Amino acid sequence: MNRLFRLLPLASLVLTACSLHTPQGPGKSPDSPQWRQHQQAVRSLNQFQTRGAFAYLSDEQKVYARFFWQQTGQDRYRLLLTNPLGSTELSLTAQPGSVQLIDNKGQTYTAADAEEMIGRLTGMPIPLNSLRQWIIGLPGDATDYSLDDRYRLRELNYTQNGKTWHVTYGGYTSDTQPALPSNVELNNGAQRIKLKMDNWIVK
């Protein structure tokens, strides 16, 4: 299959929206009770959704899109990528043991692993299995991470399939309890992924 994306070049607009602002102030210890309490509060969120701006940047391709992420239960989530005109470029629906992806031509694909499938079909090696944790400010399987001055995740390093992802958090929203990320950037040296969340809805 050819590249799924034929997005319009609103690069400057989206990149500006996705620019990161590193939190200031001294970091806190990952062993602190405040961090454990924050993690417990985030893990208790069974259902949530967010939307915003997405950018994928590499030497091979540059993709700019709007995204919608919805989790409806453990291992049940939906990801939509739309172009600047609002047309759906990719729709991915995951549930335990099964993933379905529909491309911009209406073609449907199924697989057992979302991460493998989206990388194979789009050419974008997005670490979806880890991103599900990182997008809500949890380190997932990463053990090398640091906190900001409010006991929230500030950055982490995680090696997967020979690639080390460096993840930085540019801010958190105060509109939700617990606070959730408003900017996240993933960088492995060859690829960068930027997410700017416009809003969160939690249950």
Swiss-Prot record:
Signal peptide: 1-17
Transmembrane segments: none
S-diacylglycerol cysteine lipid sites: C18
Lipid-modified sites (N-palmitoyl cysteine): C18
Major location (coarse): membrane
Gene3D superfamilies: Lipoprotein localisation LolA/LolB/LppX
Protein name according to UniProt: Outer-membrane lipoprotein LolB
PROSITE patterns: PROKAR_LIPOPROTEIN
InterPro entries membership: LolA/LolB/LppX, OM_lipoprot_LolB
Assigned protein family: Belongs to the LolB family.
Pfam families for this protein: LolB (PF03550)
Alphabetical keyword list: Cell outer membrane, Chaperone, Lipoprotein, Membrane, Palmitate, Protein transport, Signal, Transport
Assembly notes: Monomer.
Superkingdom to which the source organism belongs: Bacteria
Gene Ontology CC, one term: cell outer membrane
Localization, UniProt: Cell outer membrane
Job description of the protein: Plays a critical role in the incorporation of lipoproteins in the outer membrane after they are released by the LolA protein.
Membrane topology annotation: Lipid-anchor
GO process annotations (BP): lipoprotein localization to outer membrane; protein transport
UniProt lineage: Bacteria, Pseudomonadati, Pseudomonadota, Gammaproteobacteria, Enterobacterales
